[in-house]
Design a protein with these regions (language model features):
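Motif I (Walker A/P-loop) of helicase-class P-loop NTPases
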Residues: 36-48
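Hydrophobic residues on the short alpha-helix immediately C-terminal to a glycine-rich phosphate/catalytic loop
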Residues: 16, 45-48, 65
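Short basic/glycine-enriched coil/helix segment immediately N-terminal to the Walker B
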Residues: 22, 114-125, 138-150
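Alpha-helical elements of the RecA-like P-loop NTPase motor core of helicases
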Residues: 40-43, 63, 136, 161
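Short amphipathic alpha-helical segments
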Residues: 66-68, 139-142, 164-165
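SF2 helicase catalytic motif II
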Residues: 132-133, 145-167
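A substrate-engagement module of RecA-like helicase motors
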Residues: 3, 28, 50-127, 132-135
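Conserved pre-motif I regulatory segment
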Residues: 1-31
């Protein structure tokens, strides 16, 4: 946390540490009001794991994590956020994606901006992304993003509507 946790953060962390030591818990949900410091709690918890994903569904939260903890993580964004070096337009229309053609910029020795951030995020101890991107990557069984020891999903109460929107 960088500084001593506030009372409610310390209480939440105490319960989380207890639950993590107890093998009966696969999922832990922290529900607390805005401003309590859930992001700081999440960052403290992930520090105890070898590697983790941090998923947040909103740009506001992504910006907050990037601003407050950017040096501790690598962010990965979807292709539409990057220009394609093989043709005009964004990388979501790239031949290597749309037509599954081989592209020299999809290799680690000369990556385009999309692949550069993707390769860095794959190797990072902590990767920041959004549920939509990670769901699509894992569903497509794309190489690179392997299972991690921990997944922190900020705003997890919105996951049901997120998955319903995919149908």
């Amino acid at each position: 946390m960088g500084q001593s946790p506030r009372k409610y953060q310390a209480e939440a962390l105490s319960v989380i540490w207890w639950a993590l030591k107890n093998d009966d818990f696969d999922n832990i949900v922290v529900q607390a009001p805005t401003g309590i410091g859930k992001s700081a709690i999440a960052m403290t918890v992930q520090d105890r794991f070898r590697n983790a994903y941090l998923l947040t569904p909103t740009l506001g939260l992504t910006d907050q994590y990037r601003r407050d903890y950017g040096s501790k993580m690598k962010e990965v964004q979807g292709r539409r956020n990057f220009a394609c070096w093989a043709r005009s337009g964004t990388a979501d229309g790239a031949p290597c994606y749309k037509k599954k053609k081989k592209c020299r910029h999809a290799e680690e020795d000369d990556p385009c901006p999309y692949y550069e951030q993707k390769f860095a995020a794959e190797k990072a101890r902590l990767t920041l992304s959004n549920p939509s991107y990670m769901f699509r990557v894992t569903q497509s069984q794309a190489a690179g993003f392997e299972q991690r020891d921990l997944a922190v999903i900020d705003e997890a109460h919105n996951l049901e509507s997120f998955f319903l929107d995919l149908l």
